[in-house]
C-alpha cells in the first residue's frame, strides 16, 4: 500500500466517527499533521481536541479494528469515498460552513454542469402537497433538472420518484450509511436512485439513522 492509499485508509477511520464533521477533522489534522498522525495520537491526544465521549468512541473504534475491513470492502459493496483534496469531490460542498471530511456515494454524483433543485417538505403531507410534489418532480425530471432531496417519506420521496418516472435524475442525501435504506418503506426509490442517480452520505457504511444525524445531513 503506497503512502497516499495509507493516508486514505486512516482518513476513513476518521469518517467512521459520526460525531466528527469537516471543521473538527481539520482541527485534528492541524494538531496531529495527517490522518495517520491523528490515528496514532490515541485517546490521550484526542482528548486535547474533542470531548471525552467522542475520544472514548474513537478509542473503541480503534480497539475493535473493524473499520479496516469496512474500508477494504467499499469497492465490493460498490461504495465510493471521496475527500475534499481529491478530484470528484462536489465543489459546492466546499462553500458550506462545515463541509464534510469525506463523502460516500453509490451510483453517481450530481453534475456541476447541470442545474439542480432541492425539493424538501413534510413527511406527513396533505393530498394537495402530494399533488404539487408529483407535478414539480415530473416537471424537473422532464426538463433534465437534477432533483436532490432526502429520500424521506412524504414530499421528499414523492418528488424524487416523480422525477425518475419522468426520465430525470435524482439524488438522495441520507442521514445514515449509503448501504442502509431509511426509511424502509422507500426501498423501491432507494434502489432506483442507486441505478438512475445516486445515494449520498457523509456517514460511513453501517451507521444507522439517528435523530442527531439529520440536521448535519440537511
Tell me the role of every PLM-derived stretch.
Residues 1-142:
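Short, positively charged patches
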Residues 2-5, 83-218:
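Glycine-biased, small-residue-rich flexible motifs in mid-sequence functional cores and linkers
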